[in-house]
Amino acid sequence: MAKTYANPLLPTSQFPMCGNCFRADMYKGCAFGCDYCFANNRGGNFERDFQVANVDLIRKWFKEAIEDGDVSNIKKECLNNRVPIHLGGLSDPFQKCEEKYRASYRFLEISKYYKYPVNISTKTAHLDDMYWEILDPKIHTFSLSILGYSDEYVRTWESATPLATERIAFAKELKERGFWVSIRIQPIILMEEVEKLIKASENYVDYYTVEHLKLPVDNADVCKRLLQKMYGVQTQLVAKGREYEFDSVTKRKNIEYIKSITNVKIGCGDNDLHVLSDSLNCCGIDTMPKAFKNWLKYNSMYIKMTGDRTQWSPSANCNSCFNGDCVIKGFTTMSQYVDKAYAAQYGDPNQLTLDLL
């Protein structure tokens, strides 16, 4: 019997800059085993032992928050306000173990019962018929992750995922069934692969989110192994916080080029280039169906792009969203962390232009 995943539903620590951070993960651990996965590669934050969410407990939280009006903690306050959920923030909801446990299926059943909006992130290329019976384009959207187009390139970085052509075919099927669909091109490593992917998929998607490769500063073994695979990449990685990243000039040039080759809206997942996005959230949640309207707008990206600080933000204590060493003494609310992150990112809490500092 699998261990129970104790914390399957909670806003992530990315909420200061992300409006689609109320994540649900039905599994802890992922069989797709992508070499670049931040969840597996960052030290200390993601255990590798397999665990399954207690879906009955999640159902209880939904009932208490939505039917009984319980807003006693951050997750229940978000549920009560129908903040859209991002399913698959750390592990794929449709990996192989779903055939045995059906935790994602049961979670989507809850979503359908409460007509609750869920954005599904996945690398899958197929769903059994039982899923189509509960999925609803009004409340369910899909973000498919694909890093490139050619089989050899994909297999260099991903050993157990469907090929890009299979995932693109799945995107086409989703569009034909009426779903909002995006492709998250992450990580960007070789631009020629990005261009091939866009040309093969742009007729089937509503949005692209793009984000460049990041390597963990605190995991030398992973860095060494992945750097050996980066043949043909003409850029210098620079240290920024906990990660090595592409330099900002290269990232900006890449984004400008991507925008020049497609008419599909682009969202920029790199934290330093959020404002180059074609929408107010890098994953495009503001372009999803109206059921998603209550996304968490009080974040640094939204404020930077609109100047609007009047949007609702949860009042419950949010410190459970962080590891202990990231909690700031005296802070309890999301808005406090957002305001601090905004000032740190842009230098002045009242600076509202779209200039990149």
PLM regions and their residue ranges:
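Conserved Radical SAM active-site core
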Residues: 2-143, 149-151, 339, 343, ...
